[in-house]
Amino acid sequence: MKNFVFTSESVSEGHPDKIADQISDAVLDEILKHDPNGRVACETFVTTGLVLVGGEITTNTYVDIEQVVRNKIQEIGYNNPNYGFDGSCCAVISSIIKQSPDIAMGIDNENEEEIGAGDQGMVFGYACNETKSLMPAPIYYAHLLMKRQAYLRKQNILSWLRPDAKSQVTLRYENNKPIVIDSVVLSTQHHPEIQQKDLIEAVIEEIIKPTLPTNLLHKDTKYLINPTGRFVIGGPVADCGLTGRKIIVDSYGGMAKHGGGCFSGKDPTKIDRSAAYMARYIAKNIVGAGLADRCEIQISYAIGVADPVSVYAETFGTSKLSNEQTTKLITEHFDMRPGKIIKNLKLHTQCYQKTATYGHFGREDENFTWEQLDKVDIFK
């Protein structure tokens, strides 16, 4: 396609599914802080007055899961009983077992480089030159809107804002380049006494306009603010939340393929996470080097086997090299065995909670080692 319209969405840290993601990654972080080789597959379910944490965890450390959960919920902003969900008084249930020995036998290896993949599957990484972060523009701007909403809420600049919110940005493309924002949808939970007219004006003037580039906004850009007219009841009171239910928000907003496995709550031996980071790392360096305008990488694995089953690069006709030549460069210069990915991207020492909101890719924090452009010379 050359001329088209494309939409991506983001959600706030107070969205039920994102609460679940953050709790799962908070548990993971606490374990890896004391046991870098801990094996974690942590799933979280949140609903009215209840948090259920389950999964398979093998570690030599102790973690007070209940306290981790309560701290994270209150940090997000659910610290008031009037919100209907409060980290200080909700019920917390934990149901954790050890990792299956049948799985562990395929992963455990004294030689870190030969650690087998934690499961079969394929992952995708993507990059394009639409934004400075080499991310697709719709998801990039949708995330920025949610960051702005959280900032105004936490700084008490708009005191009527509440933690739950969603954004959606639609861009019009010509010749595969974003030229204008067609519409912005933003729904935010709010105090019951704020008037709809005042809310709409504040969201447009304080959230949208300071965040989105003026050259992409125009007189016909449509602003759809809290379209139902009221969003007082939100968070887990309105909808239950589950870990891994926002995988498109977490990745590329639908602009690229997704292997299907979520990221949050998984230690880096799980290729759903570590290999997806590696695929982004490769794709970003290809685009960052100017070799291609767009690049999508697929890597696939078999459980218990270190080397990938397959590697494929797609540059959509924008590269100076063929897809086959690009793939050959990748396999020659990047070690995609899980153990080497973990070592080279320093995945045992990450703060994974930072990834659980506003996307795992396109971030400027040094914590996001897979965003480094330190391999561009390979592709020049």
Curated annotation (Swiss-Prot):
It is an enzyme of class 2 (transferase). The keyword Metal-binding applies. Binds 2 divalent ions per subunit. One of its GO terms (cellular component) is cytoplasm. Its main location: cytoplasm. PROSITE patterns: ADOMET_SYNTHASE_1 (PS00376), ADOMET_SYNTHASE_2 (PS00377). Pathway: Amino-acid biosynthesis; S-adenosyl-L-methionine biosynthesis; S-adenosyl-L-methionine from L-methionine: step 1/1. GO terms for biological process: one-carbon metabolic process; S-adenosylmethionine biosynthetic process. Its EC number is 2.5.1.6. Homotetramer; dimer of dimers. Belongs to the AdoMet synthase family. Catalyzes the formation of S-adenosylmethionine (AdoMet) from methionine and ATP. The overall synthetic reaction is composed of two sequential steps, AdoMet formation and the subsequent tripolyphosphate hydrolysis which occurs prior to release of AdoMet from the enzyme. This is S-adenosylmethionine synthase. It comes from Rickettsia prowazekii (strain Madrid E).
